[in-house]
Amino acid sequence: MKFLLTVLTALAFSQTALAAPSCYTQAEAVAEQAIRIHSELMDIGLNCQHMTPSGQKNLYQSYREFTAQHSGLFAAYENTLLGYFQRTGAKNPEAALNTMRTEFANKISLDSAKMRPDLFCGHYMPRIQRVSTMGQSDIQKWASTFFPGHPTTRPVCGQK
């Protein structure tokens, strides 16, 4: 009986050690925020491109240029999240990342569906215009700023 208890205890501890926590590291939380921001900008650019003010660059084109200019930064954020999904045992980390992006885009699409297009675009369009002038450090600072209305989908390890 004592042997069985020892084996079961050892097994329990080994399973605990093998199980990766599902909470985010700080870097993973920042990466999620960055991917959420990027997904929202895409949706804004697509939904509001027809309302681009006269004489200004098409909003979706501005979004695409912003993406190209900062592709390395967003690729690094994606790699961080792929690492999270691998660490937590996702069968297909890339599919998990794509699902996350889709869920973020769907949320802003639902917000846009609840508003008249002119009101939605009037409210969100300035984001595209603002990011077109941002440098990498500005984007990193934005992604590192957590807002109560936009919590991460998972808790950050060690935070309550």
Spell out what each predicted region is.
Residues 19-25:
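Cleaved targeting-peptide boundary
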Residues 14-17:
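N-terminal signal peptide c-region/cleavage motif recognized by signal peptidases
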Residues 30-73:
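Early exported N-terminus immediately downstream of N-terminal targeting peptides
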Residues 22, 63-160:
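Compact alpha-helical subdomains of small soluble proteins
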Residues 1-4:
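Positively charged n-region of N-terminal signal peptides that target proteins for export
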